[in-house]
Structures are given as structure tokens and as C-alpha cells.
A protein has these predicted regions:
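Phosphate/ribose-recognition catalytic cores of enzymes acting on nucleotide-derived substrates
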Residues: 5, 48-159
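Short, small-residue-biased leader/transition segments that mark boundaries at the very start
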Residues: 1-3
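Anionic-ligand-binding alpha/beta catalytic cores of soluble enzymes and soluble regulatory domains
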Residues: 8, 13-61
Length: 159
């Protein structure tokens, strides 16, 4: 058995939960993923939402995120899987308040590419691959849809 007598560090920077939180909350996802040596992820139960994504052509799985230290609000390239599965599906996620719809509560909404099916009450693991952009309030739903299409192209190119 090996017992470490010094804190873990990389390039003279001590890796701590405080440092990881700081990086997460400032949008430095690449740093977090490097320090963890894996993709930062959230596991949660899919809950029924207001169906806003579905109404505008981008159905989402709304993930319960209470009890998590969260990343900077914004749009992310992600991949997700059911907890007991090994098959990941790429997608895009909005972590935030949905300012175009005057949202008050922070939500994680995940749109999975080439997926159809019912995920309600299933548990998903969502791995965050890349920060795409900060959350923004759009003047109308058409502007939001136009931006989502641009974000989808970026997310699909993410490895």
C-alpha cells in the first residue's frame, strides 16, 4: 500500500476541490477535465419539463442537478448514456436559466443527436466535452432556434 505524504500537484499547482470548483465556475472545462483525467460529468434522473425544447424542434432530457457543484452556465458539447449502459450518444446541453423564456431555476437540458425514445425517470450520465458559449437572452424564439442550429454544428464536430 502506498500512502501519499504530499498533495497531488501538476506544474507546481496543487490539485484540490477548491481549484476544480474555481475552474468549473469560470468555464475552464478543459482544465477540469485534464486535472480529473476524465470528463467532468453529472449523473441525474430525467424529469418532465415544460416541453419547450420539443415545441421548438429540439427535444431535451431535463436532468435533476440538485446537490451538484455546477459549471459556468452556458451551452456545452456533451455525450450521455443511461447509467447501466456503455453506449454514449453525443449531444448538446444548456446548463442555465433559459433567459429567453424568463427561467428562474437553473436546469440541465440535454438534446441527444439521432435519438428518439422516452427517457423519463431514467438515470443518465452526462459528460461535458466542450464549453461552446455563454448563455444569452434572445429577442425571440426564432433567433434562439437559429443560434441552436449553429451550436449543433459546433457540438457535432467536438470529439
Amino acid at each position: 500500500m502506498c500512502i501519499r505524504d504530499r498533495p497531488l500537484s501538476i506544474k507546481k499547482k496543487i490539485i484540490s476541490s477548491s481549484l476544480l470548483r474555481k475552474y468549473l465556475q469560470s468555464g475552464r472545462l478543459n482544465n477540469v477535465n485534464k486535472l480529473l483525467n476524465r470528463k467532468w460529468s453529472i449523473d441525474g434522473k430525467v424529469q418532465k419539463g415544460r416541453q419547450l425544447g420539443k415545441k421548438i424542434g429540439f427535444p431535451t432530457a431535463n436532468i435533476d442537478i440538485k446537490n451538484y457543484v455546477l459549471a459556468k452556465p452556458g451551452v456545452y458539447a456533451v455525450k450521455a448514456k443511461k447509467i447501466k449502459s456503455s453506449k454514449y450518444i453525443k449531444g448538446i446541453a444548456n446548463l442555465g436559466y433559459r433567459p429567453t423564456f424568463n427561467g428562474k431555476k437553473i436546469l440541465l437540458e440535454v438534446h441527444l443527436f439521432n435519438f428518439s425514445g422516452n427517457l423519463y425517470n431514467k438515470y443518465l450520465r452526462v459528460e461535458f466535452l466542450k464549453f461552446i458559449r455563454a448563455e444569452k437572452k434572445f429577442k425571440n424564439v426564432d433567433q434562439l432556434k437559429k443560434q441552436i442550429k449553429i451550436d449543433l454544428v459546433t457540438a457535432k464536430k467536438t470529439k
